[in-house]
């Protein structure tokens, strides 16, 4: 279906990788859990390319990765309880579902009134987000329905020629992120 050259980068190339993302490219990179597949936030065409390369259903929203609580506040409503949870558990393998800010475009959330946000516990990814100057929309770096990889070779087996670039390396391979729904204060739910 897609056939492009997937460029290879090292973690030291963070500025070049950030430029690719800012220019709407789809990039795979190791995170604190599994390999992620990301695009810059607020680029609808980049998000479409990500979903196409992954074979992801259109109606499934992509989680947002942020570098700090201030970025969270720009895209989600952050009641005091959510700020306290973020301070206690982020950065880490912890995703909060929050009510989105009215200014957040519907295509980011697939029309849902909520947004999933995570601050990864990975210095490279945090630096990458800061270099981009905006959050990233990041999902697992695999074809939908296929095994999620923690090593670059696993990702390339599925996505080589379907994505613009990959940052070589290995994810920390921790368990998937714990998800806490804080969209209705007073009623929190959790799943791992």
Range-by-range predicted roles:
Residues 1-191:
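Active-site-adjacent structural elements in enzyme catalytic cores
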